[in-house]
Amino acid sequence: MKFVLLFGVLLVTLFSYSSAEMLDDFDQADEEELLSLIEKEEARAKECTPRFYDCSHDRHSCCRSELFKDVCTCFYPEGGDNEVCTCQQPKHLKYMEKAADKAKKFGGKIKKWFG
């Protein structure tokens, strides 16, 4: 019985040691992958397409406004056969940004009155 108990403890110890080493290997790989993704995102962030500019080359490259990212909207101009794509802000998001800005200003006034 003592032999079985000793063997079980040894087996659990070896298993936990090997699992810890495997996790360390995965952590190192994850860190390297995360760093490369961050570098790519930083490079991509510098290359965003401003509002009302052509985004047909990359429809996910529109810049962010204060709160929301602009959307690449495509349409056919009147009397034209070519599709035109530009980065635009949807109206509902524009109104939400205006409301958030007014709420910030109102919050500042309340702080000034009571603060």
Swiss-Prot record:
Q: Which PROSITE patterns match?
A: SPIDER_CSTX
| Tissues expressed in | Expressed by the venom gland.
**Main localization of the protein described in the UniProt heading:** secreted
Its domain of life? Eukaryota
Keyword Phosphoprotein found: no
Tell me one GO molecular function of this protein.
toxin activity
In Swiss-Prot or TrEMBL terms, this protein is called: U3-lycotoxin-Ls1a
The positions making up the signal sequence are 1-20
Q: Which GO terms describe its cellular component?
A: extracellular region
What InterPro entries does its record include?
A: Spider_toxin_CSTX_knottin, Spider_toxin_CSTX_Knottin_CS
Q: Per the record, what about its domains?
A: The presence of a 'disulfide through disulfide knot' structurally defines this protein as a knottin.
Family (UniProt): Belongs to the neurotoxin 19 (CSTX) family. 01 subfamily.
